[in-house]
Each structure stands twice: as structure tokens, then as C-alpha cells.
A protein has these predicted regions:
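A detector of single, family-specific signature residues
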Residues: 1-184
Length: 184
């Protein structure tokens, strides 16, 4: 019985590989993103059709997929809102990839996850990483460029003063008083 299932899985895998052959280049590009396996890349291509020209921007793709933040505003007050409904297969595959990316070491996506999870919670951080991945996929599919990771220290390099203040604040909460002197 197990041998029959293994044979069926092998036959389906072979058929998927044959059907994905026209999208081999896009599949390889998508797999350069940390956390994305060939299975997730296949789901992304299958659900979007592999043609990103249908979506005018990455934001349109994210909204269609259901990983764009919801909006609930009344009388100038912004309230909590859920994400928009979208493609459940694509959201599921991206969720698995986002969780895998959040556990990778030294990547921008992991830094983004931990930065948002500490403030907003783990589920919102997963959705934010899903959107970042989908934006990267749209950009790679439209330009043909490979994924270039910004690095885990991206936010520190972007705003070094903020990182310095946060480190000082953390030391002060531990009971230390720090006097900064420029290095000579």
C-alpha cells in the first residue's frame, strides 16, 4: 500500500515537473528567496498563472492574493482591520514560506519578521513577510533579476541613530548608565 502511494507521488511529481518546464526560469528565480522551496514556487506560479503583467504593480498582486493590510477608517480614526480575502492556496503556501524565512539566520526577511513580531504580534509579522515575499516575486518576474537580500542589519544601516538610542535605552533599563564618547 505504501509502495502504491510512493509510486503515485512520484508520478504526480514527474507530471508537475513536466507542466512547470515552461516556467523553469521563473521557478528558479523565485527559489532564490529565503524560505521558498520549489513546491511553494510551483504554487505561486500555478495560482498567478506565471504572468505578472496582469498585475500593474506589486500592491495589486498583494491585494489580489489577500496579503494586503485591510483598511477600516471612520471619521478620521483608523481601526484594526483584517487582511482582505484572497487566494487561500497562495496564502497558505506563502505562510509556510514566511515561517521558514523567519527562522533563517542573517536575512532581511527574518529581521523584518522579528522587528514586527515584537511590536504587533507573530501573525501580523507573518502576513508582512508574506507581502514582502510577494512583492519580491513580482519584481523578479517583471525585471528578471535575482533576489538580493538586504541583510539582517538593513534597519541598523538604514537608521543608525535609532539603533544607537534603542541600545542605550535597553542598557538603561538594565541599570547601566552609559556615556558616549566618539572613538578616536
Amino acid at each position: 500500500m505504501i509502495e502504491q502511494h510512493d509510486a503515485a507521488i512520484a508520478a504526480l511529481t514527474e507530471r508537475i515537473d513536466v507542466l512547470m518546464e515552461p516556467f523553469r526560469e521563473l521557478r528558479e528565480l523565485i527559489c532564490t528567496i529565503p524560505g521558498i522551496s520549489t513546491t511553494v514556487a510551483d504554487v505561486v506560479i500555478a495560482e498567478t498563472g506565471g504572468d505578472m503583467s496582469v498585475f500593474p504593480s506589486a500592491g495589486h498582486l498583494a491585494s489580489w492574493a489577500g496579503v494586503a493590510p485591510g483598511q477600516n477608517e471612520s471619521a478620521g480614526r483608523k481601526k484594526q482591520a483584517t487582511t482582505r480575502p484572497g487566494d487561500s492556496h497562495l496564502k497558505g503556501a506563502l505562510g509556510i514560506a514566511a515561517l521558514a524565512a523567519s527562522r533563517s539566520k542573517g536575512t532581511y526577511l527574518a529581521a523584518r519578521y522579528h522587528r514586527i513580531a515584537s511590536r504587533r504580534g507573530k501573525l501580523r509579522a507573518v502576513v508582512a513577510v508574506e507581502r514582502s515575499m510577494l512583492t519580491a516575486i513580482w519584481n523578479m518576474a517583471t525585471t528578471g533579476n535575482r533576489y538580493e537580500d538586504l541583510g539582517a542589519d538593513h534597519y541598523t544601516r538604514l537608521k543608525p541613530d535609532r539603533a544607537k538610542r534603542a541600545a542605550l535605552r535597553q542598557l538603561e533599563t538594565l541599570g547601566y548608565r552609559v556615556i558616549l564618547q566618539p572613538a578616536s
